[in-house]
Swiss-Prot record:
Entries under Gene3D superfamilies matching the protein: 2.40.50.100
EC top class, as a word: translocase
Family: Belongs to the NqrA family.
Quaternary structure and interacting proteins, as annotated: Composed of six subunits; NqrA, NqrB, NqrC, NqrD, NqrE and NqrF.
Annotated catalysed reactions: a ubiquinone + n Na(+)(in) + NADH + H(+) = a ubiquinol + n Na(+)(out) + NAD(+)
Stated role: NQR complex catalyzes the reduction of ubiquinone-1 to ubiquinol by two successive reactions, coupled with the transport of Na(+) ions from the cytoplasm to the periplasm. NqrA to NqrE are probably involved in the second step, the conversion of ubisemiquinone to ubiquinol.
Keywords of the record: Ion transport, NAD, Sodium, Sodium transport, Translocase, Transport, Ubiquinone
Any GO BP: sodium ion transport
Organism for this UniProt entry: Haemophilus influenzae (strain PittGG)
Enzyme Commission no: 7.2.1.1
InterPro entries in alphabetical order: NqrA, NQRA_2nd, NqrA_C_domain, NQRA_N
Protein name: Na(+)-translocating NADH-quinone reductase subunit A
Family matches, as Pfam families: NQRA_2nd (PF24836), NQRA_N (PF05896), NQRA_SLBB (PF11973)
């Protein structure tokens, strides 16, 4: 078992009851183009087209053969683009239950599948996009290979769902999915990472390796798992996938149908009844959260409060990789002499306010509690960074765009979510996730 001691479990109010409920019905879903790093779409549909579930919507020009399919049947009502015609979202009004079917196999056949059979079914169904690489966090090329594949069956993000609750209901589909993934590269490890005290279903596979992690966040991030088990570099790549996509893989290969249901955490200080709800990938979050939120100006986030995406306008949908929806209040109010008050209702990792000494949960808002200023190395980053890197030096190199120095200090192992805690504790209010992405893009382009 690997124990993570450095990090932070955010004491935020609105923790979800770990019981699965039916969520609000949604009649609109979307694929969010900006979730896929570096993707340039070649559209196969236009507004007004009627599509079936599993039908191709677009293909990645930069990654030929990688296709993106409809999570539900219906009519294409909008193809939203931003600056420089960047694809923001492809919106579908859900109608009917028309679907495209794919190859299916019996449970006994799964362990005899060839790598090519697995790859072909994943690509044709669009489930290939559930896989992501490290470094760079991109959908892998269909011709590439990985040193190993990581399955993340734990989640330490604030307000997250407990994977064991979800997997208890889908244990057979999950083990079927593991079997399928083990056939993708039969001679290479398939790493299943789980919480040490969790009851996660497993199966007896030759290349399956099970790893237990415990401790504070980011113990549940795949970047942490990769760092301690099979570190990556410029010449070495691993792939990873989350546990609910493994369920989808299992269902695809045994039913021949694309499975796009999600069990997510709907939680946060502004949610009336924080709980786990069933919904669909790409669900319209305004519809999903209708009558679920407290009054006032709220920020709905697809993903974690630490590193999720703001859900509004053309991005008002559940992300492809998001397993939670978090809701906090907009912190627009100015405080009179806030900087000299005891602030018993605020939290600080540096113990500068009285709230730090209480054991209560806090109603966090979007307020940064200060403006941007110079980066101040006071040991905050080291407290929350469990990886074997020098965070202050790495963050400095990221800020100034020193790609050589950043590579030497380990930036290729990281994704935006791995630096979310550094952003949270930063006295200078830097957003290190977006800075990291700029550096990674430059490294990939220029070397």
């Amino acid at each position: 078992m690997i124990t993570i001691k450095k990090g932070l479990d955010l004491p935020i109010a609105g923790k979800p009851a770990q019981v699965i409920h039916s969520g609000n019905a949604v009649n609109q879903v979307a694929i969010l183009g900006e979730e896929y790093v570096g993707m340039r779409p070649s559209m196969k549909v236009r507004e007004g087209d009627v599509v079936k579930k599993g039908q191709v919507l677009f293909e990645d020009k930069k990654n030929p053969g990688v296709i993106f399919t409809a999570p539900a049947s219906g009519t294409i009502t909008a193809i939203n683009r931003g600056e420089k015609r960047v694809l923001q979202s492809v919106v579908i009004n859900v109608e009917g239950d028309e679907k495209i079917t794919f190859a299916k196999y019996s449970t006994e056949q799964l362990n005899t599948l060839s790598s090519e059979q697995v790859k072909q079914n994943l690509i044709e169904s669009g489930l290939w996009t559930a896989l992501r690489t490290r470094p760079f966090s991109k959908v892998p090329s269909i011709e590439s290979e990985a040193s190993s594949i990581f399955v993340n069956a734990m989640d330490t993000n604030p307000l997250a769902a407990d994977p064991s609750v979800v997997l208890k209901e889908y244990s057979q589909d999950f083990t079927n999915g593991l079997t399928v993934l083990s056939r993708l590269f039969p001679s290479k490890p398939l790493h299943l990472c789980k919480a040490g005290d969790s009851n996660i279903p497993t199966t007896d596979l030759e290349n399956l390796q099970i790893h237990d992690f415990t401790g504070v966040h980011p113990a549940g991030l795949v970047g942490t798992h990769i760092h301690f088990i099979d570190p990556v570099g410029i010449q070495k790549t691993v792939w990873h996938i989350n546990y609910q996509d493994v369920i989808a893989v299992g269902k695809l290969f045994t039913t021949g149908e694309l499975y796009s249901e999600r069990v997510i955490s709907l939680a946060g200080p502004q949610v009336k009844q924080p709980r786990l709800v069933r919904t669909i990938i790409g669900a319209n979050l305004s519809q999903l959260t209708q009558n679920e939120l407290s009054a006032g100006k709220n920020r709905v986030i697809s993903g974690s409060v630490l590193c999720g995406q703001i859900a509004k306008d053309s991005h008002d949908y559940l992300g492809r990789y998001a397993l939670q929806v978090s809701v906090i209040a907009e912190g627009n109010e100015k405080e009179f002499f806030g900087w000299i008050m005891p602030q018993a209702n605020k939290y600080s990792v540096t113990r500068t306010v009285l709230g730090h000494f209480s054991k209560k949960l806090f109603n966090f808002t979007t307020s940064e509690n200060g403006g941007e200023r110079a980066m101040v190395p006071i040991g905050s980053y080291e407290r929350v960074m469990p990886l074997d890197i020098l965070p202050t030096l790495l963050l400095r190199d990221l800020i100034v765009g020193d790609t050589d120095g950043a590579q030497e200090l380990g930036c290729l192992e990281l994704d935006e979510e791995d630096l979310a805690l550094c952003s949270f504790v930063c006295p200078g209010k830097y957003e290190y996730g977006s800075i990291l992405r700029q550096v990674l893009d430059k490294i990939e382009k220029e070397g």
